Each structure stands twice: as structure tokens, then as C-alpha cells.
Amino acid sequence: MSNKKLLNCSFTIPHLELIESGIPKEIHHLLGYRCVTREEAYELVGYEFSGWVVLFCDPKGNPYLNKGKLFYRLKPDPEELKGDDPPKYLTPKDAGCRPYFSPLATEKIFNKCKKLFITEGEKKSDALTYHGFPYIGLSGVYGWKDKRIGESKPLPEL
């Protein structure tokens, strides 16, 4: 499987999205975003769409797992999705949600914070953290909870 980082996908949609989100090109290699083919996306998240993925890790930098595999979230390329209201992002079926901790925010940085900041989305979390405000990213408005244990409960990782 290709291990190309977003930095090597010059001026693709995800590259431009990161820049438009206030994340300078010079730090893209520090983040977990990467372009994927349909085959790579299927292997990582179970959906056969090209696009980009981001790896989710805990505050210590340890990747979250789902059924023994690394936990990624996929943003399909726009031309891949059909219908009136297709989802913007996809996670593996029945994987639940995980909080997103920017690789730019170490556990030490979070421990020094006097307030806890939470936002929706990985790019926002990375941009805010880069600009000096360490944030935890959630995978949507209801991304603070999931049903991994059979009933809707707050994320145990939080």
C-alpha cells in the first residue's frame, strides 16, 4: 500500500482544503492526512472511494484501533458520491466514533491547558491547534457518543 503523505499530493483537493482551513503547507507532513486510491480506501475503511484519509490517535500519539485495524476516516473525492445529500466523511461500518487529537497537540500541551476546547472536524482541530489553541476534534455534532457497546454512550476515550 502506498504511504504517500498529503505533502506529496501537490495541489489536490485535500491539499487545498488544508490550506483553506488555515494549515500551512509546511506542516502537512506532520499531520496524518494522505491521499488514497479506491483500493486503499477499501482496505482502510471498507468503502471503495478515492479521496483522502486521516488517522486518529490518542493524545500520546498511539493510533486508535477498530477490530485490530488502524482507525481512519475517509473524505471521498466529490465526484465519487452520488445522491442529493451524500455523507462528507465515512468511517468503517460499526466502528463508532473516536475523538481526534491533532498530532500538533501533545499530551503535555493538553495537560497545561486550563480549559478544554472541542470542535467539529479534524481540519479545524489541526488549524486551531497550529494557531495556539489545542482542540479536540469530534466527527460531527453527535460525535461525542457512539454505540460500540450496544447503547448510545459518551465516548470512553474522552
Identify the meaning behind each predicted range:
Residues 42-158:
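Phosphate-handling DNA/RNA-contact segment within nucleic-acid enzymes
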